Amino acid sequence: MGQVARPPEDSVRQWDLPESDRRALLRWGLPHDAHMRPLFQEGAAPVLVPNLAGERERQVASPGERLYTLVHWGEEALQLRIGTVAGTGRVLKIQPKPTTVDDFHPDLRESNAGFYDPSVEFFSSSVVQFVETSWRCHVALGIAFELWQDPPEPDRPWEEREAWFSRLQACERIILEQVERIDSHVRADDTDTLWSTVVTELTHAGN
């Protein structure tokens, strides 16, 4: 499920990040898979500018903050980037603008009234924690994905499929509990965290 990708050393050594964050990136790099693809920026100056479109974004980032690009997440058309804030090392998801109900097809707007996906969201408390979580999820999700690819045959009793689905949910729960162990700001029981999205996105790929 992917290979290691490391950032350009000359650039990272100039980044305004805690030394432990720079060391983690240079030593371990990040996994490369179909959903989260490392996209390390060149140069010493952070290039990501968060769009503080509303209150939810301003709870996560502050005016004037800039981020170093680490990862391209999801489809290119979505322009989702994961970056680390210069000075603090916090890791955030950045997109050009919030996604609102106005972005849905007209037939879907009523059923999604009030939908709001902010342009800035918290991912991890530090690069160190993001790197460790990324690698541990990368390995664990490989096992969970194998389980997802091996469901009971359609003609088997419903109880077997229910048991299979329960095992898959248990795998996800274990993974998210380990994420919380690494970073206490990412609650295992909070389905709105981005790590929860990563876990369920990979194990339910194609559903």
Question: What residue spans do the PLM features occupy?
Answer:
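Compact, glycine/acidic-enriched structural inserts
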Residues: 89-147
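Alpha-helix boundary/N-cap detector
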Residues: 16, 118, 122-125, 159, ...
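Generic detection of intrinsically disordered/low-complexity segments and helix-coil linkers/edges
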Residues: 9, 22, 62, 124, ...
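A surface-exposed partner-binding patch
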Residues: 1-87, 96-99, 173-207
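An amphipathic alpha-helical core segment
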Residues: 135-179
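Surface-exposed intrinsically disordered loops and tails
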Residues: 49-55, 105-114, 156, 162, ...
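Charged, low-complexity surface segments at secondary-structure and domain boundaries
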Residues: 5-12, 111-118, 149-151, 181
